[in-house]
């Protein structure tokens, strides 16, 4: 059953989506957001695998901006969204989005009176960013406590060695690595970590 569009590029406070968000928050559901409508660019992404390389990160950034400026996280602060691919291109445009919200509130602050960058700490993402510099930027955006291991399995844009970027990120302590590789996901899902070691799980 499809409850949401493939990406949340139009996630505004409509009656239907408010009801849906309320139910998801009540049930402690985690909403994993993965892009797919990345072919609708008037043919400009036809070559060089660009729907996947450029279109997907852009779609994810649009979804995040819709959630932030659509007032969803203000109305439902316990609602957990986890965005694929390290939040797409959102971390690099985060400052631009916040600046736009400040200088054009007539366009950007119609639904939400809280600056987007004040809500970043409520976002979750996976770790699939492919290099250390991108991971560092992501950490500065959502916090290392809100990043879970991403694999993109079985698709070719996943890491060839799952978790390698996390494992090799030098600023991390061993506890940080443990958190990103599995413990953060346990906390995000709200489950007892001990059940993972239960053979009947």
Identify the residue ranges that each predicted region occupies.
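Mid-to-C-terminal alpha-helical segments outside catalytic/metal-binding sites
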Residues: 71, 79, 89, 124-125, ...
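Active-site gating/metal-coordination segments in enzymes
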Residues: 1-70
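Distinct, well-ordered alpha-helical segments
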Residues: 13-17, 42-45, 94-98, 134-139
